[in-house]
Amino acid sequence: MGFLPIALPFAELEVGQHLYWQIGNLQLHGQVFMTSWIVIGAILALVVVGTRKMERDPHGVQNLLEFLWDYIRDLARTQIGEKAYRDWMPFIGTLFLFIFVSNWGGSLVPWKLIHLPSGELGAPTADINTTVALALLVSLSYFYAGLSRKGLRYFEYYVHPTPIMIPFKIVEDFTKPLSLSFRLFGNILADELVVAVLVFLVPLFLPVPVMFLGLFTSAIQALIFATLAAYYIGEAVEEHH
């Protein structure tokens, strides 16, 4: 991917530039690791604050956490089914929270004020490596869900309703993580690019409505990713007759 500089300090955006950490023979994207750990720290802090002093009549952060718990529980129950959803609620909830906080952090936190030797900080989900890793994690999870619940009977899925479907089902196993990863990556990166370009062209008020639209889109993308992950797991544990 090429190099795209936008000269204004508060609107600077560099696509394809990374801060690399060398660990053995591996090159890691340092800025993605930094922002990912910041996101994880923010989620952990939210949980600690919300559960430190539990009350029967919740308010504040505890009320927010209970709302999220109920919402994720309903989502998992609807997509996975009554029998198996409890086992997968923590996974679906963690996915949703990580993506949601990452997306909103990319829109609300002024990462570009923090200067790096190379590249710049931004939403972890605006990096293709993060979204591919999340999508592969979902793929491994629904394979595990199917095999752990059905054993070798899981592979009946590939011949249901007819063996003619085998090549299509195999192709589907590759397209699921691709669609998950590129949908999330494309939307979040496009949102950051649009806001940066508008700030460069009209730096005062025009970008504000676009930023609010970006927040809405970011929340929807987190919901779509979590819903599809739950749906794929539900599809894997579903009994075929």
Swiss-Prot record:
Keyword Transferase: no
PROSITE patterns: ATPASE_A
Membrane topology reported for the UniProt record: Multi-pass membrane protein
GO CC aspect terms: plasma membrane-derived thylakoid membrane; proton-transporting ATP synthase complex
Transmembrane segments: 30-50, 91-111, 128-148, 193-213, 214-234
One GO MF term attached to the UniProt entry: proton-transporting ATP synthase activity, rotational mechanism
Intracellular or extracellular location(s): Cellular thylakoid membrane
Keywords: ATP synthesis, CF(0), Hydrogen ion transport, Ion transport, Membrane, Thylakoid, Transmembrane, Transmembrane helix, Transport
SUPFAM superfamilies xref list: F1F0 ATP synthase subunit A
Pfam families reported in the protein's UniProt record: ATP-synt_A (PF00119)
Family that this chain belongs to: Belongs to the ATPase A chain family.
Described function: Key component of the proton channel; it plays a direct role in the translocation of protons across the membrane.
HAMAP family for this protein: ATP_synth_a_bact
Quaternary organization: F-type ATPases have 2 components, CF(1) - the catalytic core - and CF(0) - the membrane proton channel. CF(1) has five subunits: alpha(3), beta(3), gamma(1), delta(1), epsilon(1). CF(0) has four main subunits: a, b, b' and c.
Protein name: ATP synthase subunit a
Organism, scientific name: Prochlorococcus marinus (strain MIT 9313)
Gene name tied to this protein: atpB
